[in-house]
Amino acid sequence: MELDEVIITRAIFDEYSKTFLDYTDIDVALVGGGPANLVAAKYLAEAGVKVALYEQKLSLGGGMWAGGMMFPRIVVQEEATRILDDFGIRYKEYESGYYVANSVESVGKLIAGATSAGAEVFNLVSFEDIMIRENDRVTGIVINWGPVTTQRLHVDPLMIRTKLVIDGTGHEAVVCNTILRKIPNAKIGELGLLGEKPMWSEVGERLAVNATQEIYPGLIVAGMAANAATRAPRMGPVFGGMLLSGEKAAKLALDRLKTI
C-alpha cells in the first residue's frame, strides 16, 4: 500500500475533531493528569460515566514519573496495594507495610488502565477558568491549548459543560484557586485559604483521603490538591494516599451524579 500524507492528516484531524465535539458535554471533567485523577478516571469510566481528563502538559502522571529525587521508585502502603493490583502494577515488600514499585511502570499502567476503561484524555489542553450558573455552582470548565497558556498568547478559549469537576492539579490546586480569586465571598474548605503544610508523610497521607470531598458546589478535590485545599501536610514520594484519594473521588462523584 502506498501511503498518502493527506489521508494521514485527514484521519488525525477528523477523528480528534469528532471526539472533541462529543466531549463538549460530559458527566465529569478531571483537571490534571496525576495519579489521583488517573485512578478516578478508570473507576468512573468503568461505571459508565462519560469522563474526560485534561492535562496541560504533553505527558500524564504528575510527579510520579521521577519517584523520589529522580530515583524512579515509589513507596505505597499496604492498604493501597489493592489499587496497584487493579492496574496490574508490580511491587514488592521492602519492610512490613512498605511496598516499592517502579515509578515508570506505575505511571504507564495508570494511564493504560484509565484509557482502556474508556476515559478520554485531552493532553496539551489547559484549564483556564470555570463555568458557573445559579448560586455560583460550577457547571463546566474553560479550556485552551497548553502552549497558549504557557506562552501567554492572547487566544480566547473554548468551554466544556460538565456535571462535576475534580481538581487533581496537585500542589497548585488550580481550580480551587480560580474559585477563590473570581467568585466574591467564595470559601474553599473550613479555613477558606489554600496551601499545604510542610512535610509530614504520616499525617499528609491520612489527610489526603479524608480531605477528598466536594469542597465547593460542583467541585471535588483529589490528591495533593485536596491537601492544599485543606492545609494538610505534603507527603513526598509515598503514593498510597494519592491512589486512595482518586478512588474516593470517583465514589463521591458517582454518588453525587445520582442527585444531579
UniProtKB/Swiss-Prot annotation:
Iron as UniProt keyword: yes
Its BP terms in the Gene Ontology are: thiamine biosynthetic process; thiamine diphosphate biosynthetic process; thiazole biosynthetic process
Q: What class of enzyme is it?
A: transferase
| SUPFAM superfamilies per the UniProt record, alphabetical | FAD/NAD(P)-binding domain
User: What is the top-level taxon of the source organism?
Assistant: Archaea
Q: Which UniProt keywords apply?
A: Iron, Metal-binding, NAD, Thiamine biosynthesis, Transferase
What does it catalyze?
hydrogen sulfide + glycine + NAD(+) = ADP-5-ethyl-4-methylthiazole-2-carboxylate + nicotinamide + 3 H2O + H(+)
Q: Quote the PANTHER family the UniProt record gives.
A: THIAMINE THIAZOLE SYNTHASE
Give the record's subunit note. Homooctamer; tetramer of dimers.
Give the similarity note.
Answer: Belongs to the THI4 family.
Q: What is this protein called?
A: Thiamine thiazole synthase
Q: What is the lineage of its organism?
A: Archaea, Methanobacteriati, Methanobacteriota, Stenosarchaea group, Methanomicrobia
Q: Which gene encodes it?
A: thi4
